[in-house]
Amino acid sequence: MSSNYRQIGTREKALSINLDPRIYGSFAEIGAGQEVSANFFAAGGASGTIALTTSAYDMKISDSVYGASKKYVAEPRLVTMIDKEYTNLSDKLSHRKKETMFFSFANTVEVLNYYKTNKGHGWMGLRFQLSPGSPPNECVLHVIMHDNDGLMQQKALGRIGVNMLYGVHHYSHDPELFINSLLDGLGHGRIEIDMLRLSGPDFDHIDNRLISMLLVKNGITNAAMFGPDGNVLQASSALYKKHILVLRGRFRPLTHVNL
């Protein structure tokens, strides 16, 4: 991270976005992740940023909006949410497209339950433009929450959501800076980001395998995984109910493995 980097607080970031007349979009949050849009409302001036918020907690209500799903806290569910919300936004507000950078943020989250018998984790995604009228980009990530309190996990998730939206508009030129900024306002060890993918016309030059390596390098996660096609994977999902054989290897360079 640059020595000139100044960490900015959650409220300041949210207010900065709210006061930028070019950035306008929607938030869709299902499950326990209901804190991201709340940060923008609390900062003031939210009418300059928020066109729509959708909040669903009951599974049947969620199904009525996004269709039935076998798993709710999963990447396919997140992608369905982003697709629906961004299409709806760009269709309904097409008259603004010449001066607006649209975005649709979504998350689907499970936080620690009352009995603390589960593990808090969630999927977060953002489809966004970096200039008015341009094709959209996408940022998708998976988080594991380590706070031993459900409310603390929700608040941490809310901060990451603000950091995502602020980061793509201010740090997209520097992937490592963007990655580190996602944890602004969060103490060490509270959140683990074990998968992150950037895609779209403004990120064609980005190799997401190297993004995964940066997550490990910067201590944001302990392991990175990607398939033979180069696509990054969320390890626990990819290895679920699989028989695993591990062989020691070396990476020279990082994009090739030698066994």
Question: For the regions a protein language model found, what residue spans apply to each?
Answer:
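Non-catalytic terminal extensions that flank enzyme cores
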Residues: 1-251
